């Protein structure tokens, strides 16, 4: 038994090493004296120290390496003895007289190495004898190291193709047979280690077994290095024999390590040509074997092989690599009923990555993988294993990363079915990944059908999903997600107006049912996208769709009205107000007066009912005046109604300065230089006079409230409006009215005033002087004004 106490073990190792060193010394002295008899005597005593059962594998290895070094010296001595006339056959028989079996076999292997070198007997006969004789040691630890020594000293003496030991009687088949037999016996010893000692020490024994695995695996490495082991021999002899031993040993540690060894040490070409044999063994392994890692590594190796050697790609199709891997994974999962969901998902993730690398043009293969994954996930509900969820995201991201094109992923019918197994938070993450892929690669989604499929995938960020109790989305994250959706809208495009209208209708359906908090982010870009569509419509009489065209400006404006109506309820009345005015301008360009009037009406209703903040009212009124000034579609009646309303709003603003500025801004609604029908000088003058009256009232309020005359800035602003209309030739704006206003301002300026107003007035006077210097009508008009 191996001792528990590390201190005792150190003492035993020290004692063994001391005895070993002493006998090694006497052995070397005998070698130096060419005394074969004493050399054998002391070497046997030295090797007897390897008979101990008190050392752990780690400590035993220390002792073994000392023996290995001394045996190399002994082997050289044996070789010299044969040159001096000693018969190698007699030497081979002489070493077998050692009293204990373990030293005897070490010496026999050493003498056998010399025997093979002399070529006095076929190598295969000696190797067969040695590998059979080693059966005499059945203690797992001692037997493993003995056979490891045999493998080490024989590896350069195998009758391989091109080897000096190859001959008529010695072929690579003999070399393979020897290595396979030694491998089989070593694996049996290694597996038996698990049964040595009490059950409570099982964990320690498994750790120690892990430390010894390379002793067994080196045999497979030797096989992979033999020149004579070509594909045929590997397929017909090596692989079946190795797999038979792996399956029959029924030990999870051995099975996992050795299957992995096969994958790592033999060429990729061999794996490709023997896939069915290798994969056929996988379902026969113990259920506890980590077959997920093994198969993932196999697929990774094959993927890299295909990536580095384009000429081998036809062979993947020829051997039906994908089908074999897909079937094998299904059988493994079926055989291991308790396989964790993580392992199953990882297997399909690896298979999908393999498929995308090796068969990027076979979307049907990729879809099959996703379908198989769905089959395994069915009935399991949402995945709550964090690592499994992460692996599922990796699986779903693979097609996006490979093709850099979401459109290709949309062709995979099973893709959205896999997405359904993600939890709410992960759906949100996956949706963001998809949107970023579209933006990064500038991918255009060009049909309503594809947009529908896309939105099914990214509903994690466009719909209020059934979120777990207590799950709150960070506001910054939410805004970032919605901004990405807003950008996405501009990637949904088709030159055909009919198809584009179908696309925006799909967007409308999803956005209006996606929850109110998202609308302020998604409706504006949808409106912009729809307005772009209007600009692309053919002019009347040039419609390629004829009278029956399904997309008309009227239909689109009705559509816009429906989506903007949702905004005041969010509430986002300011946003809806702006969008109504934008739509009114678009209707103006389409010469749709009733529609434009309706949009203005909706904007006015929002102004009256929803916009109550004084600053917001000022901004809104500026937008109304600016938009109305640009409108050309309205007839006299409709325009009068709208301008009358606007001037009424201006006069009702809370603050006098705001009232004044809004009223004089309304003057522009009554004089448009390029439209003779809208040149009403009387109403222009009326607005300016009303503005002066309000400015005067504002100054009086300032005088009453603060004891000061207040700023004359408003008067100077009104003067600038007078000058503007005077320059435009409005008859009602006379020289006298301008001079009178200048005189008023000068009188006010005689009072204490603020420097900014003085500077403003001075700049205005300088402008007037500059205009006087101009030639023509402008100069003449300004020269008439006496300052």
Curated annotation (Swiss-Prot):
Function text: Plays a role in vesicular protein sorting. Component of the membrane-associated retromer complex which is essential in endosome-to-Golgi retrograde transport. Also involved in the efficient sorting of seed storage proteins. Binds alone to endosomal membranes and is required for recruitment of VPS26 and VPS29 to membrane. The VPS29-VPS26-VPS35 subcomplex may be involved in recycling of specific cargos from endosome to the plasma membrane.
Keyword Ribonucleoprotein: no
Origin organism lineage: Eukaryota, Viridiplantae, Streptophyta, Embryophyta, Tracheophyta
Family annotation (InterPro entries): Vps35, Vps35_C
One BP annotation, GO: protein transport
Taxonomy, superkingdom: Eukaryota
Keyword Transport on entry: yes
Cellular component aspect of the GO annotation: cytosol; endosome membrane; Golgi apparatus; mitochondrion; retromer, cargo-selective complex
Pfam family, one: Vps35
Coiled coil: none
Family statement: Belongs to the VPS35 family.
Residues with the N-acetylmethionine modification: 1
Organism of derivation: Arabidopsis thaliana (Mouse-ear cress)
Keyword annotations: Acetylation, Cytoplasm, Endosome, Golgi apparatus, Membrane, Protein transport, Transport
Location within or outside the cell: Cytoplasm; Endosome membrane; Prevacuolar compartment membrane; Golgi apparatus, trans-Golgi network membrane
Gene3D superfamilies membership: Vacuolar protein sorting-associated protein 35, helical subcomplex Vps35-C (1.25.40.660)
Subunit structure, interactors included: Component of the retromer complex which consists of VPS29 (MAG1), VPS26 (VPS26A or VPS26B), VPS35 (VPS35A or VPS35B or VPS35C), VPS5/17 (SNX1 or SNX2A or SNX2B). Component of a retromer subcomplex consisting of VPS29 (MAG1), VPS26 (VPS26A or VPS26B), VPS35 (VPS35A or VPS35B or VPS35C). Interacts with RABG3F.
Membrane topology (UniProt): Peripheral membrane protein
Protein's UniProt name: Vacuolar protein sorting-associated protein 35A
